[in-house]
Amino acid sequence: MKASMFLALAGSVLLFVVGYASESEEKEFPIELLSKIFAVDVFKGEERGCKGFGDSCTPGKNECCPNHACSNKHKWCKVYLGK
């Protein structure tokens, strides 16, 4: 059941992208669209100078971004909720 729902959703998305790209006048539009969809370089921690949620860290070095804290147990940055 889950697999069929996933395939239906993936097929719908693919149909939408192909239909939208075919209406475009530019021939390189599908390549540009796919490169923008799969561009994940925006979320890298090195560019922001601190480590975000889920990034590995060393406790006590204050490497995590504001509102995050390095977990002593798991050794990765978590959202700091305070006490």
UniProtKB/Swiss-Prot annotation:
Q: Keywords of this protein's UniProt record, alphabetized?
A: Amidation, Disulfide bond, Ion channel impairing toxin, Knottin, Neurotoxin, Presynaptic neurotoxin, Secreted, Signal, Toxin, Voltage-gated sodium channel impairing toxin
Q: Which GO terms describe its molecular function?
A: ion channel inhibitor activity; sodium channel regulator activity; toxin activity
Q: Which coarse location class describes where this protein primarily resides?
A: secreted
The record lists its disulfide bonds as 50-65, 57-70, 64-77
Tissues of expression? Expressed by the venom gland.
Positions of the pro-segment in this chain: 22-48
- Where does the UniProt annotation locate this protein? Secreted
Q: Does the keyword Lipid biosynthesis apply?
A: no
Q: Which PROSITE patterns match?
A: HWTX_1
**Which first-to-last residue range defines the signal peptide?**
1-21
Q: Which residues carry this modification: Leucine amide?
A: 81
This protein's GO cellular component annotations are:
extracellular region; host cell presynaptic membrane
Keyword Lyase applies: no
Question: What does the record say about domains?
Answer: The presence of a 'disulfide through disulfide knot' structurally defines this protein as a knottin.
Per UniProt, subunit arrangement is: Monomer.
Function of the protein: Lethal neurotoxin. Selectively blocks tetrodotoxin-sensitive voltage-gated sodium channels (Nav). Does not affect tetrodotoxin-resistant voltage-gated sodium channels or calcium channels.
Protein family according to the UniProt entry? Belongs to the neurotoxin 10 (Hwtx-1) family. 15 (Hntx-3) subfamily.
Q: Please give the name of this protein.
A: Mu-theraphotoxin-Hhn2j 4
Q: Which organism is it from?
A: Cyriopagopus hainanus
Lineage, highest ranks first: Eukaryota, Metazoa, Ecdysozoa, Arthropoda, Chelicerata
